[in-house]
UniProtKB/Swiss-Prot annotation:
InterPro entries: GrpE_coiled_coil, PPIase_dom_sf. The gene is grpE. GO terms for cellular component: cytoplasm. The keyword Chaperone applies. Keywords: Chaperone, Cytoplasm, Stress response. Homodimer. This is Protein GrpE. GO terms for molecular function: peptidyl-prolyl cis-trans isomerase activity. It is found in: Cytoplasm.
Amino acid sequence: MKNKILVKNNELTVDISAFDDKDEVLSLQRKNFNLILGKDSFLRGFDANLIGQKSLPLYEFSMVIPSDFKDEKLRGKTLDFKVHNKAKIKVNSETNLDKEKIKSLEKELANQKEKNALLLLDNVKLKSEKEKIIKDFKDEIKTFENRAREKIAEKLNLEKQLLENKFEDFKKYGSQKIFESIMPIIQNLLVAIE
């Protein structure tokens, strides 16, 4: 156990004691507890107090109990912990990466970075194409609106001209009818005057 540093996925068998001031918190007491570092299987944030420490038979630290802890009385309290390491560290295979696996992962990471760069480039191209399509569509709408306005203006001018012509015809016809209706009266007056 000497000179080993605790890392994620190390497996420890521990006894855990928790204290609120000097009073032991029995609900957090564990005996022969199998603790896989990084999983936070005992308490959220607990493992972070052990990861990076040298392998020792006893660890002592304080931590604040998470605000979503099941026991409402303990939420937000700072408790003192004693963790007795009872067995040798089991090193899970995930922590023993050999050089070939590291190279493979580095290559995979490089490939993924290249794919991400290509996807980013494609996204930029797609965005540019999308912007061009939107601009072209807006231009077509403006052209259509202008043509529609011209057609409407032509139609209105034609209708206006037709109405003006009808009005002139009506004025001529109306004047003629009025003249025809008063003509007998004028003739009678002329006859009466003579």
